[in-house]
Amino acid sequence: MKHLLSILALFAIIISSGAEAATPARYSTDGDLMLPENWREWVFIGSPTSPDSMNSGEAYQPGFKYVYIDPESFAHWKKTGTFRNGTMIVQERLKVVEAEYMDNHALIPGDYIGLSAMVKDSKRYPDSIWGFFSFGRPPYGEQVPEIGSMDNLGCSGCHYEADQDWVFTRFYPVLLAAKPVF
């Protein structure tokens, strides 16, 4: 009996270790990505900023970029240093406002100006592994089609050159600090 229980316990461990956590990505029946729930409660990984004033008056995608990763994928990242299938990263853009702050010149976040997301799903996006989406300006769309496949480049044109698995990890100290060293 002891031997049987040991085998059953080992079998349960093997099955559970191969199971992936569910993705936070939800899709409509048409395949459009649904607006993620509570993304501002996810793990905040950084805020790259591209002000027009530092880019000859016209930055590519100007603004503060508040970037979040879903908690399950961040936990996976901390264990493996990889982005699991199902990872969702959300970027919310805000205007850059130049202001006086405590006797200093400062750049502070202004109004929300856009929301985008990328989802890692090797079955749904076999060419690029990641799907890219824009929910537009506030109020954000409830569901949106993919905007960046390898066929039309879009977001994937830049992300193809990213540091690791289509993600510009060098811009996110939270990811770099949490990445395990093997």
Regions found by a protein language model. Name each.
Residues 62-74:
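Short, structured beta-strand/loop micro-motifs enriched in basic residues and often containing a Trp
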Residues 55:
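Active-site microenvironments that recognize anionic phosphate/pyrophosphate groups
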Residues 18-21:
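Boundary at the C-terminal end of the N-terminal hydrophobic targeting segment
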Residues 1-5:
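Positively charged n-region of N-terminal signal peptides that target proteins for export
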Residues 6-16:
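Bacterial N-terminal signal peptides
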